[in-house]
């Protein structure tokens, strides 16, 4: 069954006001800017944004008044530093922020994907991240303490039940609470009409975010025939049965890069930073690049054909051919 929708219909039908949305999960590449801009155009409100280190899309949505809460490791412009709208929202407007790390964002999403209430970790021990943070609870390991080579402190590899000869381990851990987004939005290189998607490059926490979510929107550079997807099952990192809508949107991740399609637009990132220093600046930027364009095609026309061509990948680096015969 075809799940192909326009961006407008996908956002209108699957993202209500008040939803929690995971996006920008592939770190600095394949950020779904076109989807974020459609959320802004539709004036979605009271959203919770979920992500690891989160580039300027979060800041744009905050500046547009869409966001009530952020759950992330960092928000800003990775080229230029702190994000102006994010800082204003926190310092002046009291926007709620839950601070996680890249790894604990991954653990929280993976726990939800597995259907368990939490996953344990040692990485947050001693960190201020856990202070007054609803996503962390310090717990004691129910198993014997193990050293760096998988041996217990006595050198015995055999497991011991709590209360056994060596008693309960004194190892401290943090339980990281499961995080289930209402919607995960991802950008991929290609997909078929049923939502089966090929993606390559840096996955970040995309796979965890897709599997954890209640609903998934996959935005693709191009829609291809099912035979293309079936030809390389190892690249089908998003199966169609997890996807609620698939949207074809060339250049939909600009100004972030998409491997094999176009480069990162460093000039655009710098300009956005310089042009959003105040609320008035941000409003003018949004009027030009979001409200002033009806869709991604109009956005690309405003960007200009020469700029689009300049950003296209010129030096391709193809992977070796894989033989699935047996």
Language-model regions: role of each:
Residues 1-151, 164-326:
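Conserved alpha/beta enzyme-core scaffold
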